[in-house]
Each structure stands twice: as C-alpha cells, then as structure tokens.
Amino acid sequence: MSILLYFFFLPVILSLIFMKKFKDSKRNLPPSPPKLPIIGNLHQLRGLFHRCLHDLSKKHGPVLLLRLGFIDMVVISSKEAAEEVLKVHDLECCTRPKTNASSKFSRDGKDIAFAPYGEVSRELRKLSLINFFSTQKVRSFRYIREEENDLMVKKLKESAKKKNTVDLSQTLFYLVGSIIFRATFGQRLDQNKHVNKEKIEELMFEVQKVGSLSSSDIFPAGVGWFMDFVSGRHKTLHKVFVEVDTLLNHVIDGHLKNPEDKTNQDRPDIIDSILETIYKQEQDESFKLTIDHLKGIIQNIYLAGVDTSAITMIWAMAELVKNPRVMKKAQEEIRTCIGIKQKERIEEEDVDKLQYLKLVIKETLRLHPPAPLLLPRETMADIKIQGYDIPRKTILLVNAWSIGRNPELWENPEEFNPERFIDCPMDYKGNSFEMLPFGSGRKICPGIAFGIATVELGLLNLLYYFDWRLAEEDKDIDMEEAGDATIVKKVPLELVPIIHH
C-alpha cells in the first residue's frame, strides 16, 4: 500500500518542486545552504534549533533562507534585519503561520498568541492589555505575588535548617505556577482537586513537544497527513489536546459552580474579568467572546507565563552562583536598601530601590531569552529585508538568542556582566533591537509587566533571605540547555540555601 501511495504522490511532488524552482529563479532570495530534493534543509537541522540556526547564519549570513520540505523559512539573526521585520514591515509580518498544533490548541485561532492578524487578534490583544496586563491590573495581583513568595521563603528556611539541597528549578516553577493559577482562577494551586503540580508540569512538557512543525505542515496535504498518521502524530496531538481541554473544563466549571472555593472572594480574578466581558457583549452586535476564547486566553497566560518567568529566574540564579562577584554585589544592594525585616514579608515596593538587581535581570534576558526564536511570524505580502526578496507566506524566525550574543553588538558577549547596562538606554520592551526577549511590534508579548514583576520579587526574596552554595558533590554548575520553544537548564538547578542573619 505504501509503495502504491509513493508512486501516486511522486509526480505531484516533482511538479510542485519544478514550479517552485521556476518562480524562485526570478527573485533575489536570501542565501541558503545546499538543499536536497523534497526534504530541503531538514537534514541540516540537528541539535538545539536556536543554536543550529545560529551556526548556519554565521556561515551563510544574518538573513538566511531554509527550505523545510515544501515551506520557506527565513531566519533573522542581526539587529538591522530584526528591526526591518519587527518595525519597518511589522504590519506585513504580524500574522502567525497556521500549523496543525497551533490550530488545535488555539481552537482555530481563538487565542492571543496564534490568532491570525485581523479583528479577532486585535480584540483579544486589546482585551488582554486592558483587563489582565495593564499597570493597574498587574498591581492588583501584588498581594498574590507577595503571599506566594512568603510561602516559598518559609519552605526554603525549613530546608536550610536541615541543610538539605533544594531543587531550585522545581521550586521556582511551582512559585510562578501558583502565582498565575491564583491570578487566573482565584484559588491556590494546592486547593484545586482536579489539578496538581506534577500533572501541570507534565502537560506543559507535552504541549511543547507536540507544538513543533509536523509533516502535515511542511509537505503536501496527502503526503504529510499520511506520514503523521503512520508516526502516530495525529493521535498524540489529539490526546494531549483532550487532556488540556479536560483540565480547563474542570477549573472553569469549578470556578462557575463553586465561587465560595475562591481564596479571595472580594478580588476578581482573570476568569471573572473575561466572563464579565462575555456577559456585557451578549447584546452587542460586534465581536463576541466565547468559552473557546476564554480557554485560549487562559492557556496562553498559564503556559507562556509560567515558562518564561520561571526560566528567567532559574538562569539568573545559575549565573549568580557561577559569578560570585555579581552575587555579592546584588545581595549587598538588596540587604543595604531593605535593612532588617523581622516578621513582615518583603513587599513589592522594595524592588523600586534595587537598580543593580534590575541590571542582573536585564543581563539574564540578554544571554538567556526564554523563547530564543520568539514565536514565528508569517509574511502577508511580498517584502524586502536587507535587499532580499521575501515572498508572501514565508515563515519568519527572529533568533533573539543569536542577536543577544553578537560580538559586533556586545563586548565579551558570553560573559555575564550586568554592569554593561549602567547608563545604557537599551531595554527589553521591544524598543531596542539589540535584545528582544519578548519580541517587538504588534505581536510583542503582552504580559511583560506581569512577568517582570514576578521575576523581580522572586529573585529579591531568594537573595535577601539566603546565601547559596553548590551541593558538596558539585564542583560547578552545568549550564547546558534543553527544550524547544522555550529553553531551560537541562540539569535542574540544585543548591543549598543558607539562612542569612
């Protein structure tokens, strides 16, 4: 059967290849590594994707064309090219490519991250900025961040008294997960009978795993579908989606049926805000939110929010332990500015005094952007980038990791040196194309303020209350990376906390 299918599809594939080559010969396309028939450059993409693309760009140039099966992908690895994509041609490049996984998990474009550019994406982004990520709303969740950090400190003190080694990676993922769960659902993570820490971590891992490009995305419909069917990809994708959807149904239904379970009755959470908007729009003729939009938004907030904030804190702590001079300077600033805290917990307003801590976070984001390739974009029209023709419906990837380590932009780029940002106007909010941890333009991450507030307070608590050392058996910290869309430390960060008196 498979041999018959091969002979049936072969003429179709060869015809498509010929037509593509004829069109490409008339354009000034970006440089590209040598390709193989049908698979294109797929055979050259080994190892961590962002590092592989970094190496290919060093060899072929900062605007690099790759052919993945039957789709074109352009990789951007310079500040100048990134500015053209994200600023000059932002409008022509502000939609997302439609893939099997993104269509499934976004419920066909009903979320913030993957909605195609248009009325839906604009309304969802406006809704998120007003109701969830505005300065006022971020500040309203301050009590959650302070309470959850206080709980983390108490648990770490128990471990410190016993001189136990702590898995700080797990601790920080749980901290951020708890903060976002409370802000979203109005109850503590450990209070929901349908949710547990291990299940959420497992689902987050599974979603990332099935979220990459599949054969259906890069080969003609029949061929790609058949390859995914044989490999079990369709079945796995559906299974993970059902698990995520079931989890969301449980927490949303519980929220609606048992409002008394909420930790803080008098303070609206994110679901409250979305439901209120849905009710208000019932009589409105314009764009209407549905439960699918609600699920898509929650999924974006939780999956993206937990990963990025926790990963940033983990890399920051790893770099600080690896660089004791920087650690000492950060702790001295924190302990001098805050003074002695007896019974009361650290408050978020304390962060405003800590300029060096902010530099540490900025340097961490330069070296370790949590999503090194950002989220993919797709051109909606023919454009030119650095003089090269970029056809419509080309996937664009901006390698923020590569730009952040470019020796033409940064002195000693591999060195962790927060002082490089003293009196430096560069920021991480999409205005400086030398570092783009959250992207830029119309598709910039809307949750920057919430994420940075979480990271600042988390690191402040870790560095104020504790000194840190490696476990006896460890001589150094393994900084090897792992992951797909987001990049974590491959080996969990295990440290011994010592209570600072």
Curated annotation (Swiss-Prot):
Keywords: Heme, Iron, Membrane, Metal-binding, Monooxygenase, Oxidoreductase, Transmembrane, Transmembrane helix. Coiled coil: none annotated. It is an enzyme of class 1 (oxidoreductase). It is a single-pass membrane protein. Its EC number is 1.14.-.-. GO terms for molecular function: heme binding; iron ion binding; monooxygenase activity; oxidoreductase activity, acting on paired donors, with incorporation or reduction of molecular oxygen. The keyword Thylakoid does not apply. It holds the Pfam family p450. It is found in: Membrane. Heme binds at C445. The keyword Transmembrane applies. The chain crosses the membrane at residues 2-22. Its main location: membrane. Its cofactor is heme. It comes from the Eukaryota. One of its GO terms (cellular component) is membrane. Belongs to the cytochrome P450 family. PANTHER family: CYTOCHROME P450 71A9-LIKE ISOFORM X1, CYTOCHROME P450 FAMILY 71 PROTEIN. This is Cytochrome P450 71B3. It comes from Arabidopsis thaliana (Mouse-ear cress). The gene is CYP71B3.
